[in-house]
Amino acid sequence: NLFQFAEMIVKMTGKNPLSSYSDYGCYCGWGGKGKPQDATDRCCFVHDCCYEKVKSCKPKLSLYSYSFQNGGIVCGDNHSCKRAVCECDRVAATCFRDNLNTYDKKYHNYPPSQCTGTEQC
């Protein structure tokens, strides 16, 4: 769920998920349109696409089990829905960590009017 995703983000990046990722670029936060603006925004785009694939599992609410091991995240559920949602969140949190070097504050509160073009999942 979103609280577990937030915990993953903190653990993987050291950043506050609300201030750092809730309104970044064209896809980090609610909704999304246009082309992702950088690698971090693309992490959010891929996460949105992943949630779309598992929407019947109610990904924003679904509780799953996971742990942090050797600097990474391990999803623990055998339940297919819970595991799928966990994997969406794990991949995104890891993507944020892997792209910290290109994270750019100019994309905070990015105006939606600048989000043009189209991108397919």
Swiss-Prot record:
<keyword id="KW-0964">Secreted</keyword>
<feature type="disulfide bond">
    <location>
        <begin position="75"/>
        <end position="86"/>
    </location>
</feature>
<dbReference type="GO" id="GO:0016042">
    <property type="term" value="P:lipid catabolic process"/>
</dbReference>
<dbReference type="InterPro" id="IPR033112">
    <property type="entry name" value="PLipase_A2_Asp_AS"/>
</dbReference>
<dbReference type="GO" id="GO:0042130">
    <property type="term" value="P:negative regulation of T cell proliferation"/>
</dbReference>
<protein>
    <recommendedName>
        <fullName>Basic phospholipase A2 RVV-VD</fullName>
        <ecNumber>3.1.1.4</ecNumber>
    </recommendedName>
</protein>
<keyword id="KW-0442">Lipid degradation</keyword>
<keyword id="KW-1015">Disulfide bond</keyword>
<feature type="active site">
    <location>
        <position position="89"/>
    </location>
</feature>
<keyword id="KW-0800">Toxin</keyword>
<dbReference type="InterPro" id="IPR036444">
    <property type="entry name" value="PLipase_A2_dom_sf"/>
</dbReference>
<keyword id="KW-0106">Calcium</keyword>
<dbReference type="GO" id="GO:0005576">
    <property type="term" value="C:extracellular region"/>
</dbReference>
<comment type="subunit">
    <text>Monomer.</text>
</comment>
<feature type="disulfide bond">
    <location>
        <begin position="50"/>
        <end position="88"/>
    </location>
</feature>
<dbReference type="InterPro" id="IPR001211">
    <property type="entry name" value="PLipase_A2"/>
</dbReference>
<dbReference type="InterPro" id="IPR016090">
    <property type="entry name" value="PLipase_A2_dom"/>
</dbReference>
<dbReference type="Pfam" id="PF00068">
    <property type="entry name" value="Phospholip_A2_1"/>
</dbReference>
<feature type="binding site">
    <location>
        <position position="31"/>
    </location>
    <ligand>
        <name>Ca(2+)</name>
    </ligand>
</feature>
<feature type="disulfide bond">
    <location>
        <begin position="43"/>
        <end position="95"/>
    </location>
</feature>
<comment type="similarity">
    <text>Belongs to the phospholipase A2 family. Group II subfamily. D49 sub-subfamily.</text>
</comment>
<dbReference type="InterPro" id="IPR033113">
    <property type="entry name" value="PLipase_A2_His_AS"/>
</dbReference>
<dbReference type="GO" id="GO:0047498">
    <property type="term" value="F:calcium-dependent phospholipase A2 activity"/>
</dbReference>
<dbReference type="GO" id="GO:0050482">
    <property type="term" value="P:arachidonate secretion"/>
</dbReference>
<keyword id="KW-1203">Blood coagulation cascade inhibiting toxin</keyword>
<keyword id="KW-0479">Metal-binding</keyword>
<keyword id="KW-1199">Hemostasis impairing toxin</keyword>
<comment type="function">
    <text>Snake venom phospholipase A2 (PLA2) that has low enzymatic activity, is devoid of lethal activity but has strong anticoagulant activity. PLA2 catalyzes the calcium-dependent hydrolysis of the 2-acyl groups in 3-sn-phosphoglycerides.</text>
</comment>
<feature type="binding site">
    <location>
        <position position="29"/>
    </location>
    <ligand>
        <name>Ca(2+)</name>
    </ligand>
</feature>
<feature type="disulfide bond">
    <location>
        <begin position="28"/>
        <end position="44"/>
    </location>
</feature>
<feature type="active site">
    <location>
        <position position="47"/>
    </location>
</feature>
<feature type="disulfide bond">
    <location>
        <begin position="26"/>
        <end position="115"/>
    </location>
</feature>
<feature type="binding site">
    <location>
        <position position="27"/>
    </location>
    <ligand>
        <name>Ca(2+)</name>
    </ligand>
</feature>
<feature type="disulfide bond">
    <location>
        <begin position="57"/>
        <end position="81"/>
    </location>
</feature>
<feature type="binding site">
    <location>
        <position position="48"/>
    </location>
    <ligand>
        <name>Ca(2+)</name>
    </ligand>
</feature>
<keyword id="KW-0378">Hydrolase</keyword>
<dbReference type="GO" id="GO:0005509">
    <property type="term" value="F:calcium ion binding"/>
</dbReference>
<dbReference type="GO" id="GO:0005543">
    <property type="term" value="F:phospholipid binding"/>
</dbReference>
<feature type="disulfide bond">
    <location>
        <begin position="49"/>
        <end position="121"/>
    </location>
</feature>
<dbReference type="GO" id="GO:0006644">
    <property type="term" value="P:phospholipid metabolic process"/>
</dbReference>
<keyword id="KW-0443">Lipid metabolism</keyword>
<dbReference type="GO" id="GO:0090729">
    <property type="term" value="F:toxin activity"/>
</dbReference>
